[in-house]
Amino acid sequence: MLRVPPVIVNFKAYSEAVGENALRLARVAAEVSEETGVEVGICPPHVDLRDVVREVGDEVTVLAQAVDAAEPGGRTGHVTPEMVVEAGADGTLLNHSERRMLLEDLKDVCRACINEGLLTIVCASDALAARAAGALSPHAVAVEPPELIGTGTPVSKADPEVVERSVEVVKEVSEETAVLCGAGITDGSDVRAAVELGADGVLVASGVVLADDPKEALLDLISGLE
């Protein structure tokens, strides 16, 4: 199994994380990883994948934000697993609440990504969806209730049962699949709460990308792993 970083930062489509800003954030993640010894994952926009890989690909885990259920060929605007591999990325997110997929498409693309050797992280909105995601045997399932995303209210505190239950059901169907906690994670105490509930790590976004000092924000998050 490929290693799943305990902290993954999704850049989304924030202007603070596109182009030169994406490279700046990527360097911050690399610095923090080197200083703390904690593996960090980052998910830059597709247009910045190759540049980010060239900049910090040897220092952090670089993932795409999404991949489409499409094969190479006449698929205008689609992103295939092969394209992500060719860009040099290590893996991808799938089925984020802002980029939902039909279950049949998710099954196909998850299998294709794993076959291509990509670290594959499937997002799920609740424990029921987490179980379905775990049944696909991805490297990780990230539990993110959509109503909490971007609110600053962490799921680990707002609804701890969904984290505990998700860990339980994912491990029932795929023991080696890691479980990440997302939605509203902003500081080290949120991370600590998630880990205490059984999560293997966290998936974050605005808490780092939009922070006044992204490096300090990331260091604070990592402190919750101690």
Curated annotation (Swiss-Prot):
GO terms for cellular component: cytosol. One of its GO terms (molecular function) is triose-phosphate isomerase activity. Substrate binds at N10, F11, K12, I149, G184, A205, S206. Its main location: cytoplasm. GO terms for biological process: gluconeogenesis; glyceraldehyde-3-phosphate biosynthetic process; glycerol catabolic process; glycolytic process. It is found in: Cytoplasm. The active site is at H96 (electrophile), E144 (proton acceptor). Pathway: Carbohydrate biosynthesis; gluconeogenesis; Carbohydrate degradation; glycolysis; D-glyceraldehyde 3-phosphate from glycerone phosphate: step 1/1. It catalyses: D-glyceraldehyde 3-phosphate = dihydroxyacetone phosphate. InterPro entries: Aldolase_TIM, TIM_sf, Triosephosphate_isomerase, Triosephosphate_isomerase_arc, Triosephosphate_isomerase_AS. Its EC number is 5.3.1.1. It holds the Pfam family TIM. It comes from the Archaea. Keywords: Cytoplasm, Gluconeogenesis, Glycolysis, Isomerase. Homotetramer; dimer of dimers. Involved in the gluconeogenesis. Catalyzes stereospecifically the conversion of dihydroxyacetone phosphate (DHAP) to D-glyceraldehyde-3-phosphate (G3P). Belongs to the triosephosphate isomerase family. This is Triosephosphate isomerase. The lineage of its organism: Archaea, Methanobacteriati, Methanobacteriota, Methanomada group, Methanopyri. The gene is tpiA.
